[in-house]
Curated annotation (Swiss-Prot):
Component of a cohesin-like complex composed of ScpA, ScpB and the Smc homodimer, in which ScpA and ScpB bind to the head domain of Smc. The presence of the three proteins is required for the association of the complex with DNA. It comes from the Bacteria. One of its GO terms (cellular component) is cytoplasm. This is Segregation and condensation protein A. Keywords: Cell cycle, Cell division, Chromosome partition, Cytoplasm. GO terms for biological process: cell division; chromosome segregation; DNA replication. Participates in chromosomal partition during cell division. May act via the formation of a condensin-like complex containing Smc and ScpB that pull DNA away from mid-cell into both cell halves. It is found in: Cytoplasm.
Length: 235
């Protein structure tokens, strides 16, 4: 089974996605919360044994520095000549946002001209699984990364847990299908509530993605920070 998660163009693209969910000026977003979401995303990729490019890890180390400076009491003030890493980061995100917007505008103009003067290219790079409105499989993965962080903490604190590696995606799909037949819809948090190991959590997530892929369930989110909901698709 080949399950693809929408790739970002780089760490700034991921950060811009996280910042834009707050729908406010870049310089007003709760930067520590954004950093924690970024780090949770990277940790989840690693836990699922997915390859993480070096540039994402470099950014992660820079973000941890910014977070520590935010949370620790200020001992020395940053001199006027020294560049504040947080301000520098926000400036880079803002600059990247402008660049991306311009790039999208140019791409749109190019596509419009192609429609007028030639046959459109028959090219499908990746068809993302759509949730509702502007939501995508990436939003589902980001929501999952938060749950993953909580479960990792639970497992770490529960010394009686014995990891299994024989969980099957097909079994998890059957389990979710049974639950949804009884309840019609369920939140993403509820999906993982009874999972007691990281392997079980990861397998359950892959089963969820597969159900979305085969259109057995639909997924929606009422707003950017509410729980994602899975609903049984009537077929």
């Amino acid at each position: 089974m080949d399950i693809k998660i929408n790739d970002f163009e780089g760490p700034l693209d991921l950060l811009l996605h996280l910042v834009s969910k707050y729908q406010m000026d870049i310089y007003q977003v709760p930067i520590v919360a954004v950093i924690e979401q970024y780090l949770a995303y990277i940790e989840t990729l690693q836990a699922m044994k997915l390859e993480v490019a070096g540039e994402y890890m470099v950014m992660a180390s820079q973000l941890m520095l910014i977070k520590s400076r935010r949370l620790l009491p200020t001992i020395t003030e940053v001199s006027s000549e020294e560049l504040d890493p947080e301000e520098d980061l926000l400036s880079k995100i803002e600059e990247y946002s402008r660049f991306k917007e311009l790039s999208q505008q140019l791409g749109y103009q190019h596509d419009q001209r192609a429609l007028l003067f030639s046959k459109p290219k028959q090219e499908l790079i990746f068809e993302d699984a759509v949730l509702n409105e502007d939501k995508s499989i990436t939003d589902l993965f980001l929501a999952f990364s938060k749950i993953m962080a909580i479960k990792q903490e639970e497992v770490k604190n529960n010394h009686t847990v014995i990891e299994r590696d024989d969980f099957r995606i097909e079994d998890m799909m059957d389990h979710l299908d049974t639950v949804l037949n009884a309840k019609t819809e369920i939140t993403l948090s509820e999906v993982f509530k009874d999972c007691t190991s990281i392997n079980e959590v990861i397998t359950m997530f892959l089963a969820t993605l597969e159900l979305i892929k085969i259109q057995a369930v639909t997924v929606f989110q009422e707003d950017n920070f509410s729980d994602i909901i899975l609903r049984k698709e009537n077929r």
